[in-house]
Curated annotation (Swiss-Prot):
Residues 12-21 have a biased composition (Gly residues). Residues 211-436 form the MIF4G domain. Residues 126-139, 146-159 have a biased composition (Basic and acidic residues). Residues 113-122, 498-511, 578-605 have a biased composition (Low complexity). The keyword Protein biosynthesis applies. It comes from Triticum aestivum (Wheat). It comes from the Eukaryota. Belongs to the eukaryotic initiation factor 4G family. Residues 161-182 have a biased composition (Polar residues). This is Eukaryotic translation initiation factor isoform 4G-1. One of its GO terms (molecular function) is mRNA binding. Residues 622-744 form the MI domain. The keyword Protein biosynthesis applies.
Length: 788
């Protein structure tokens, strides 16, 4: 019989006795046995070792021991598959759960955990197995309580591991922060200010409190609030000489850097000098300290210190000092001119004697008459004489001295060293004195609000007090009535100045005139330039720089003067108060009926006057305001007889076309609901013989000439105006030929088409209107050609 094949015993039940052992290790050991004779010991035949599978466990066999090197040789042919590694990771994940504290941030630990399965797989075969697996007794199964305890043990171990991991992470962070601090170094120390800010406002000294109060008063000082703030300044607590000096320094700095307000500050200095007490001198035997003496000392120091400042500025020659030099030059110039201006204003307040003024002029001109003064000195001289030249010439003695000064000043013009700018300043000064110190342009100075409004009224041609009425008006429209039945209270304007949002009145239309007639805003008076509204009546020019779009030949005689010029482009008289009005009462040939004339092949046209008549008739200046007021009253109460009575009381038949124009304008401005009251008013006045056909036609012509400007703000005005014209034609108040004249009075074909379309639509809806259209086919064709 053959000997058995050698059997390997590494695990319980291992070796060649089992089927698994034979399949796994027999080929490998066969190769190993063929390679080395001493590697495996013969134990039996090879065939019998495989065939006797059932008797392996029962028979005693010799244990085979392997050295470390032999096992390492076996490792070379053993590879751990990826499937086994994946299963290992899944098992570890099930045991560890979702606790993220198991994973550490340290990269070395991560590398170690990644390589752990491979190291464990390697360590299985590096140690020699000396245990007797056959003699090991089988343990009984553990009860369920032990399983729970085992899970508790695993949980405890896991918690301990987590705690140790957190401690390790904290230690790593501390170590990392300490290493960063070691690299960066300690933080820089805070730099404390020499005079740190403190929130303890209640600990201010008496002097600081007074100066703070004075600063606030000076910052709010204006000519309007002068009296109020002057009293507060006197009561601020100027009780010592030190406080007085600091207060004077604050006033001096404000006056120097705000030369426009120098007159106000000079007046303030005069008031303070008269009301503040004097203080004893700090030196024995010295003069007492007064406001005037301290102020003049400041002015003298600023004037005499200009040379040292000029030298200091000239020393700044470095390229990096150019910006600093420019700033100091600007401040130096402001201080010099401001100081000169303040000294001049103090002379007007009689706080500076004239001898100081003459001393300053001599210093600025220089002792050498042939030498050219500095440009700063020349500008200061011109500023000085602009301020006090008139006052010096009022005194005969000072005037003779001024003559000597101006002889030297005239010589400066011919000096080639003087800059052109300085030459022009000197020439302006010479011209100013020759013109008796009346400047060509108004001097810029601080003004009160009332002075600003007075100047605005003068420039805009308003009645004195118009802006004050606009600002202060608070009365409601429903006040007492005048004898004519109209309200004499002016409605509130809603705005402080003319043209401001919310204001009802426009410039040139103040509240009430001397006859207590209320004035209402009119759309024909545009919202742009108020001077365009100041014509003799209520007419306007569509643009100042372009002629009126209306053809004066289409207007009635005498109205060309009303439309052709505004007060701004006229004779140059006061625009808001014309003294006379030139008008020609020559009427158009009357045609009282509008009966159709089928046999007429040539359409009748509005007669064209060749020239205005020379006769003149004076119309009251307040006629325009009364017209606007009575129309407003009518559209409010809509009583036809009362409106007729008011119009007849005007006693101005030549002004009736203007009334028609204003009525149309005001009604269309208010909206479509006022078209019917407008037509009823015009028809009533025509029926009562108050208005004639010529009045209605000329009034429509006037409004048509303004429609191009009005239509911008009122897009529906052309259509509504066409409806008014058509209804007046139906009532025989207008001839149909007047529609052609109205279309010719405007240039925009869009407005022409809108008006004529509305006329034909309104007439076509009435049988009488259809007859008028059919009988005036030639006029219709002419109007259609104008609308294309």
């Amino acid at each position: 019989m053959t000997t058995d094949q050698p059997v390997i015993s590494l695990r319980p039940g291992g070796g060649g006795g089992g089927p698994r052992g034979g399949r796994l290790f027999a080929p490998a050991f066969a190769v190993a046995a063929s390679g080395s004779g001493d590697f495996l010991r013969p134990h039996g035949g090879g065939a019998s070792g495989v065939s006797r599978i059932g008797d392996l466990h029962s028979e005693s066999r010799e244990r085979v021991r392997y050295s470390r090197d032999q096992l390492l040789d076996l490792r070379k042919i053993t590879d751990v598959t990826e499937q086994i590694l994946r299963l290992q990771q899944e098992i570890e994940a099930e045991l560890n759960g979702d606790d993220q504290s198991w994973v550490r941030n340290d990269s070395n630990v991560q590398l170690q955990t990644q390589a752990q399965p491979q190291v464990q797989a390697q360590n299985r075969f590096t140690e020699t197995d000396n245990r007797d697996w056959r003699a090991r007794t089988e343990k009984p199964p553990a009860p369920a309580v032990q399983e729970e305890k085992s899970w508790d043990n695993i949980r405890e171990v896991k918690e301990q591991y987590n705690a140790s991991g957190r401690q390790q992470e904290q230690f790593n962070r501390q170590d990392q922060s300490s290493s960063q601090k070691a690299q960066v170094g300690p933080p820089p120390a805070l730099i404390k200010a020499d005079v740190p800010w403190s929130a303890r406002r209640g600990n201010l000294s008496e002097k600081d409190r007074v100066l703070k109060t004075v600063k606030g008063i000076l910052n709010k000082l204006t000519p309007e609030k002068f009296d109020l703030l002057k009293g507060q300044l006197l009561d601020s607590g100027i009780t010592t000489a030190d406080i007085l000096k600091d207060v004077i320094s604050l006033i001096f700095e404000k006056a120097v850097f705000e030369p426009t307000f120098c007159p106000m500050y000079a007046q303030l200095c005069s008031e303070l000098n008269d009301n503040l007490p004097t203080f004893p001198s700090e030196e024995p035997g010295g003069k007492e300290i007064t406001f005037k003496r301290v102020l003049l000392n400041n002015c003298q120091e600023a004037f005499e210190g200009a040379d040292s400042l000029r030298v200091e500025i000239a020393s700044l020659t470095g390229p990096d000092q150019e910006m600093e030099k420019r700033d100091k030059e600007r401040i130096f110039k402001l201080r010099t001119l401001g100081n000169i201006r303040l000294i001049g204003e103090l002379l007007k307040q009689k706080m500076v004697p004239e001898k100081i003024v003459h001393h300053i002029v001599k210093e600025l001109l220089g002792s050498d008459k042939k030498a050219c003064p500095d440009e700063e000195h020349v500008e200061a001289i011109c500023q000085f004489f602009n301020t006090i030249g008139k006052q010096l010439d009022e005194n005969p003695k000072s005037r003779r001295i001024n003559d000597t000064y101006f002889v030297q000043i005239r010589e400066l013009v011919a000096n080639p060293q003087l800059t052109p700018r300085s030459k022009f300043m000197v020439r302006d000064l010479i011209d100013l004195r020759s013109n008796n110190w009346v400047p060509r342009r108004a001097e810029i100075k601080a003004k009160t609000i009332s002075e600003i409004h007075t100047e605005a009224e003068k420039n805009l041609g308003l009645r004195p007090g118009a802006t004050a009425n606009m600002r202060n008006g608070r009365n409601a429209p429903g006040g007492p009535l005048s004898p004519g039945g109209f309200s004499v209270n002016r409605p509130g304007t809603g705005g402080m100045m003319p043209g401001m949002p919310g204001s009802r009145k426009m410039p040139g239309m103040p509240g009430l005139d001397n006859d207590n007639w209320e004035v209402q805003r009119s759309r024909s008076m545009p919202r742009g330039d108020p001077l365009r509204n100041q014509g003799p009546l209520i007419n306007k020019v569509p643009s100042i720089n372009k002629p009126s779009p209306i053809n004066p030949r289409l207007l009635p005689q005498g109205t060309g003067a009303l439309i052709g010029k505004s007060a701004l482009l006229g004779t140059g008289g006061p625009p808001s108060r014309p003294s006379s009005l030139t008008a020609s009462p020559t009427p158009l040939p009357a045609q009282t009926t509008a009966s159709p004339k089928p046999s007429s092949a040539t359409p009748a046209s509005v007669p064209i006057p060749d020239k205005a008549a020379s006769s003149a008739k004076v119309i009251p200046a307040g006629l325009q305001k009364k017209t606007a007021s009575l129309l407003e009253e009518y559209f409010g109460i809509r009583i036809l007889d009362e409106a007729q009575q008011c119009i007849e009381e005007l006693q101005s038949p030549d002004y009736h076309p203007e009334i028609v124009k204003e009525a149309i304008n005001l009604a269309l401005d208010k909206g479509a609901s006022f078209v019917d009251p407008l037509v009823k008013l015009l028809e009533h006045l025509y029926t009562k013989k108050t208005f004639k056909t010529e009045d209605l036609e000329n009034g429509c012509l006037l409004y048509g000439s303004l429609l191009e400007d009005i239509g911008i703000d009122l897009p529906k005005a052309p259509t509504q105006f066409g409806e008014v014209v058509a209804r007046l034609i139906l009532s025989c108040g207008l001839r149909f030929e007047a529609a052609e004249g109205i279309l010719k009075a405007m240039e925009d074909t869009f407005f022409r088409k809108a008006i004529f379309t509305s006329v034909t639509k309104t007439l076509g809806a009435d049988p009488a209107g259809q007859a008028i259209l059919s009988s005036h086919a030639a006029v219709v064709d002419a109007c259609n050609s104008l609308s294309i």
